[in-house]
Amino acid sequence: MKPTKPEGPKKPNKSNEEAEELEGDNKEDLEGPKKPNKSNEEAEELEGDNKEDLEGPKKPNKSNEEAEELEGDKQKDKKDGIFVLNYDDEYEEDLEYDDEYEEDLEYDDEYEEDLEYDDEEYDDEYEEDLEGDNKPHKEDLEGDNKPHKEDLEGDNKPHKEDLEGDKQKEEEEKQKEEEEKLKDCPWHWFHQIYPKHWGCPHRKHRDRKSVPAKERELVPAQSTKRDTDPDSEASLKSNYAHLWVHCKLCSGFNYKKILKSKNNVCEQCGSHLKMHSSDRIDLMLDPKTWAPMHEGLLSLDPIEFHSEKDPYKDRVASYKRKTGLSEAIQTGRGYLKRIHLGIGLMDFQFMGGSMGSVVGERITRLVEYATNRVLPLILVCASGGARMQEGSLSLMQMAKISSALSDYQFNRTVFYVALLTSPTTGGVTASFGMLGDIILAEPNAYIAFAGKRVIEQTLNIEVPEGSQTAEYLFDKGLFDQIVPRNPLKGSLSELFNFHGFVTLNSQVINIYNYLYS
């Protein structure tokens, strides 16, 4: 009998339905997700690729000789036993498993298609992002290349501490030099009180050039508390400062008693300093002939001016204590070289000589008194203008005084002299200051209607320096004469004598005072 071929393990028979399902699944897996509208050419290319994937890798074609060799080997193996055939069958099963693995590979092909799909969208965007990252920002390059201004300025500028140290050394050296120079001065006691010897009466320092106020260095104000050490510089200044008067024009110091005897005229530069109204009475009138008038008229608060920090009534009371006056003007009658006259003197130290309702009323009553008695009249002007705390009432005093002066000058036998001192501004300049029969002014007096600062702020123009001084205005014909303070009394007596006002002897003066007292 012929040996029968042993049958290996039978492969599972797959029904037609399962085969069709597998074919359908394979087709769907191979086709993958449908891409948006593709052209016919792309569709043909995809079909070609799918066919190759289905067929899988082509097996090499074996020739007839190789087939015969394989059959011969199988016959030899039959003689050896069934073990080899069973091994081959297992190998075939492994091959079947590999076929399943090929199906997995087909799934991998779909994954490759997904990667291709991702490359089309994501990779393109990513390349753009890379291009943006590769290009450096201009702002960053400019910021890195340009050095910071603060660093350059900081490197170029020297340290403040070094500069301050150098300045201190220079100041100390200057102080030592000045102290050595001042040791030889016989007025050494003067320099202990005022280290800067601008006002030193010694000949070595009298010819020293004056420095204008604008060019001088500002010195911080010192505390009013006196030091415990009586020999210290601060204590000397606080103890003896009330004995000296500082001249702003030449920065000189004048001893008060000497300055008063010279009618407040600076010894160094001859400038006319501000003068108290009581001192002017002593300057212009004969001794013991002054008789004040209308002292009972006092300032009230007619418009109830509101001020939280400094109420109007309190401010008036404080100026009364400081100056010893009841208002910004003193009015009365007296004798100048035995000539009986009426006189009014404004005081700038009382609220800047501002003209309020009481000031206007006193001047008006003085003018009316001179009109009734046919007396010559003198008004000394020193004012900053109308008093703002009284509003329109202070402005009305300009019209009231001008009206009284019009009645006074209607009589041709009387004579009105206006004396303008520094400063005379505002409503006083615009009213009785410029209505005199003769207008006199002191040297270098500041006379204007509006101040320099106000004009520059309102009109936006520059006011020339010196355009508001008495000398400049005299050249323009605004005044009749500029009279210094010392010969003022003699000049006034000549004017009165020239206009027919004769001097009276002592007996006539006594009778006149008895009748009109």
From Swiss-Prot:
PROSITE patterns: COA_CT_NTER. Coiled coil: none annotated. Acetyl-CoA carboxylase is a heterohexamer composed of biotin carboxyl carrier protein, biotin carboxylase and 2 subunits each of ACCase subunit alpha and ACCase plastid-coded subunit beta (accD). This is Acetyl-coenzyme A carboxylase carboxyl transferase subunit beta, chloroplastic. Belongs to the AccD/PCCB family. Residues 1-17, 24-41, 48-65, 72-81, 132-179, 209-229 have a biased composition (Basic and acidic residues). Component of the acetyl coenzyme A carboxylase (ACC) complex. Biotin carboxylase (BC) catalyzes the carboxylation of biotin on its carrier protein (BCCP) and then the CO(2) group is transferred by the transcarboxylase to acetyl-CoA to form malonyl-CoA. One of its GO terms (molecular function) is carboxyl- or carbamoyltransferase activity. Keywords: ATP-binding, Chloroplast, Fatty acid biosynthesis, Fatty acid metabolism, Lipid biosynthesis, Lipid metabolism, Metal-binding, Nucleotide-binding, Plastid, Transferase, Zinc, Zinc-finger. It comes from the Eukaryota. Its EC number is 2.1.3.15. The keyword Oxidoreductase does not apply. SUPFAM superfamilies: ClpP/crotonase (SSF52096). Residues 1-179, 204-234 are annotated as: Disordered. Pathway: Lipid metabolism; malonyl-CoA biosynthesis; malonyl-CoA from acetyl-CoA: step 1/1. Residues 87-131 have a biased composition (Acidic residues). InterPro entries: AcCoA_carboxyl_beta (IPR034733), Acetyl_CoA_COase_Trfase_b_su (IPR000438), ClpP/crotonase-like_dom_sf (IPR029045), COA_CT_N (IPR011762). It is found in: Plastid, Chloroplast stroma. Residues 243-514 form the CoA carboxyltransferase N-terminal domain. It catalyses: N(6)-carboxybiotinyl-L-lysyl-[protein] + acetyl-CoA = N(6)-biotinyl-L-lysyl-[protein] + malonyl-CoA. GO terms for cellular component: acetyl-CoA carboxylase complex; chloroplast stroma. Zn(2+) binds at C247, C250, C266, C269. The gene is accD. It comes from Oenothera elata subsp. hookeri. A zinc finger (C4-type) spans 247-269.
